[in-house]
């Protein structure tokens, strides 16, 4: 497979490795980006790539809750200038409310659903985009349900740049649930617990850690123990219940929730623009573009 400059640039942005190392890794991996990242990690050239890659696009998240149902949405705009606009902020909350009301489980279903009589959410967004003067898109949605003996926790950070919702069963204490939602926003967990991690991801991490240990020249009889210890650290980084609780470092999140009589069932964390590229534009240009519209 031909290795392009764009591929080298992408790998460099994800790993921080040099251009020559990135090109060599892509050649070795026959253009497979994930395999190239693993190659660089095995050689000790790069750290694990962040799951979210670069945080790029602008916009906001919003949460809507009604009884035993909740919704989390992400709406993207082209510029931060528009994301701070009150009309855009109202649009984001209105869409969250509509998604919850309609029970839409995907962005595609949400766009086709009714916003108000005779108007879909897609049409509503198009009309508002025309007024605001910028492309606006509904990127993703998440729906949640709970039983009467459970609690929702939700949190919006940085005015909605990050949004999180968690379902905690066994307790109706919304303060506990909100504290966990705040932790999720700060600590970026990927899974609830170890059983949620895919076998593919476990095997991939074990392979990388094994190669790292062998490249460090460790004896084979020590490598196995090293891998076990490093896998535990890996789980503590990505599994919510294994993370050290931000609000009380004496607790792991799972143990803290257990001490309150609860158990974490599910969560979702949206950060605006995860994995999306942002056009290069400065604030002054943003203002000028708005004035021209």
UniProtKB/Swiss-Prot annotation:
Q: Which residues form the signal peptide?
A: none
Q: Which family does it belong to?
A: Belongs to the EF-Ts family.
What residue spans carry the region label Involved in Mg(2+) ion dislocation from EF-Tu?
79-82
Where does it live in the cell?
Answer: Cytoplasm
Q: Name one GO molecular function term.
A: translation elongation factor activity
InterPro entries with a match to the protein in the record: EF-Ts_dimer_sf, Transl_elong_EFTs/EF1B, Transl_elong_EFTs/EF1B_dimer, Transl_elong_Ts_CS, UBA-like_sf
- Organism per entry: Exiguobacterium sibiricum (strain DSM 17290 / CCUG 55495 / CIP 109462 / JCM 13490 / 255-15)
Under the cellular component aspect of Gene Ontology, which terms does the record hold? cytoplasm
Major localization class = cytoplasm
Function, as annotated: Associates with the EF-Tu.GDP complex and induces the exchange of GDP to GTP. It remains bound to the aminoacyl-tRNA.EF-Tu.GTP complex up to the GTP hydrolysis stage on the ribosome.
Keyword Cytoplasm assigned = yes
Q: What is this protein called?
A: Elongation factor Ts
**Which keywords does the record carry?**
Cytoplasm, Elongation factor, Protein biosynthesis
PANTHER family, per this entry? ELONGATION FACTOR TS, ELONGATION FACTOR TS, MITOCHONDRIAL
Q: What is the superkingdom listed in this entry's lineage?
A: Bacteria
For this protein's source organism, the top of the classification is: Bacteria, Bacillati, Bacillota, Bacilli, Bacillales
Q: Among its keywords, does the record have Cytoplasm?
A: yes
């Amino acid at each position: 497979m031909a290795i392009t400059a764009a591929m080298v640039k992408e790998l460099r942005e994800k790993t921080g490795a040099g251009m020559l190392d990135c090109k060599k890794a892509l050649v070795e991996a026959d253009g497979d980006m994930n395999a190239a990242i693993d190659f660089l990690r095995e050689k000790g050239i790069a750290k694990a790539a962040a799951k979210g890659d670069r945080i790029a696009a602008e916009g906001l998240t919003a949460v809507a809750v009604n009884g035993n149902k909740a919704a989390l949405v992400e709406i993207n705009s082209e510029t931060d200038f528009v994301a701070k606009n009150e009309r855009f902020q109202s649009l984001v909350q209105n869409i969250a409310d509509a998604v919850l009301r309609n029970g839409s489980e995907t962005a595609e279903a949400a766009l086709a659903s009714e916003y108000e009589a005779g108007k879909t959410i897609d049409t509503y967004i198009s009309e508002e985009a025309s007024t605001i003067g910028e492309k606006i898109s509904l990127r993703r949605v998440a729906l949640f349900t709970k039983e009467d003996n459970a609690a929702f926790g939700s949190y919006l950070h940085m005015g909605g740049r990050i949004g999180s919702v968690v379902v905690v069963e066994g307790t109706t204490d919304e303060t506990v649930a909100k504290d966990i939602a705040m932790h999720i926003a700060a600590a970026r967990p990927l899974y609830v617990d170890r059983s949620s991690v895919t076998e593919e991801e476990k095997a991939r991490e074990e392979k990388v850690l094994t190669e790292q240990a062998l490249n460090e020249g460790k004896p084979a009889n020590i490598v196995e123990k090293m891998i076990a210890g490093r896998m535990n650290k890996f789980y503590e980084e990505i599994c919510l219940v294994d993370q050290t609780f931000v609000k009380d470092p004496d607790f792991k999140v799972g143990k803290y929730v257990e001490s309150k009589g609860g158990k974490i069932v599910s969560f979702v964390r949206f950060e605006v623009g995860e994995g999306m590229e942002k056009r290069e534009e400065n604030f002054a240009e943003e203002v000028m573009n708005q004035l021209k519209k």
